[in-house]
Amino acid sequence: MSTTNIVCDGGDVDGCDGERSLDLLPAALLETIMTKLDVASLCSLASTCKTLRSCVTRVLTFTPNFHVFNVSLSMETVRPLLFPNQKLSSLKLDCGRLGNSAIDILVRPSLREISLQNCRDFSGDLISEIGRKCKDLRLLCLGSVAEKVGRTINRCALEDLLNGCSHLEVLALMFDLSLYLRPSDGRIFGLVSDKLTHLELGHISSRMMTQLLTSTETSRQDSNKPVTSTVLQNVQQLRLSVDCINDAVVKAISKSLTSLIDLDLRDAPIEDPRQVSDLTDSGLQEINQNGKLKHLSLIRSQEFHPTYFRRVSDQGMLFLADKCLGIKSICLGGFCRVTDAGFKTVLHSCANLSKFSVYHGYKLTDLVFHDILATTLSLSHVSLRLCHLLTDHAVQKLASNLDLENLDLRGCRNLRDEALKAISHLPKLKVLLLDGTDISDTGLSYLKEGVWGSLVSLSVRGCRNLTDKFMITLFDGSSKLALRELDLSNLHNLTDAAIFALAKSGAPITKLQLRECRLIGDSSVMALASTRVYEDECPGSSLCLLDLYDCGGITQLSFKWLKKPFFPRLKWLGITGSVNRDIVDALARRRPHLQVSCRGEELGNDGEDDWDSADIHQHTEAQEDELEQWILGDEGDVEMEDAEDESDED
């Protein structure tokens, strides 16, 4: 375990008064205080002096929680931190640098909660071992298992899991189950704990789910009388990605899951479904048979093919509204035939609605919101993405709802400055997403008069009329800002001057996206690297995500400013690999806990945007990543400098 000596009054920490003072305190007192800290903070303390390091070593043998999601730890790091602890009850870890060899370290009988993300290099052995060892498990979340070439999962592994973990209450398997199970294998979930209340599956065929829920068994009293299966009967929250949402699967879910409160269904067909295998008005009539549903999301994604729910009309919305009078949130994506009449019926019938989302509402117009004041609605989240017929008038009507906190208008290309004038008067607004709208610098200046001080997230990606002027106006340093996330991607008129204004303002931005801004260059990186958000912290301390992909002015000079000590909290970096591949690779090796993307991938959202854009932004202030500093130390500078020298020689 590497440590860092602290210099105190010109001497080593081992000889300073600070450590001698700590020695006077009872170790039990120090350890009791340390039990309130997370793993990153404990590792930070361990690197300061021998006394604290000794206490941390003992605390790590009995701390109940080990949660590290912002850094992918290596096997060499995980082993000494986890191995001595036989009382660990909750493990949450990013496994991006781990594989099957770590199973014995991670899986232990004491665990009641396991959440492992990025398990690409694990096979089904991980799932099987959890079932064999973790008999008291209550929560299990596994992401991306066996996605690496050569890894696989077999049916037996899932059987071991469901047979062994008989107390599971939450189960989330976020990978494609259809790759490893045949449609007839759906009944394997009949082994699941009857205590299960939350089920989330990354991908499963609708046929498999339908067969699971509609299977019958013979009554013991009457061998000829079929009895409906009680599989998943206590599930309250169900979130599925299926190959095709259809009437059969909706009917099976509605009739079998009598305790259901939350239902999220998403599909992404590779071709237009046939009528017999698609969702229709009749299918919507089956939803919420038991009247308990509070949250509903039905989304057809165009990820693979431009498909929509072409067999659902306004009549289907009428059926849905009639069955969902008590619903609190609804998200409808891909209902291309539904008109104002259908959407308006939902709005006016569901008096408790607080979240309303429509994606690809091609027939939705301003008339839906014309008389919204006549309702008793108190909407906090509204998402109207890719509703091309909406104009400023609709937003003006929506803005009469002063409880709005999250407003997503991405892709509403007919929205202009008058909409922003209305939005500026929303006192609780925290998230504003305006990608692809027709707003100008003048429109954004209206925000200065109202919501600007409380706004946490702003996105103006692809708003072609914008220039540096709006940035200079908004970031003039005249007010304290709450803004954490800013997306300025694909603004072709944006220059380094805009980023200078941002850096000078000292805004505590944690997520900054500048992708495809052709006039942004090295000067912007230098300005951001030199930013001091707080007086007592190091330069550039607030940024956790920086996306510079396809910024035309970025050269190898920027990489000198992407090294430590600059950007100490940075976790995600988007860059164009062709700038200089050797330097990009050297940076990735120098900062192994920094996820460097060179192929234009969207950073940091993990696909959440596909489910419900009203909830895609989680606003938490980033804390300085002392864990990474402790793990990495000062090694690796020479390697990157060598790559730079070789580049200079070329």
What is the role of each PLM region?
Residues T63, L88, L111, L137, ...:
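Conserved hydrophobic position(s) of the canonical leucine-rich repeat
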Residues P84, V107-R108, R132-K133, G164, ...:
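C-terminal capping segment of individual leucine-rich repeats
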Residues M1-Y308, L318-A321, S329-C331, C336-T339, ...:
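N-terminal adaptor-interaction module of cullin-RING ubiquitin ligase components
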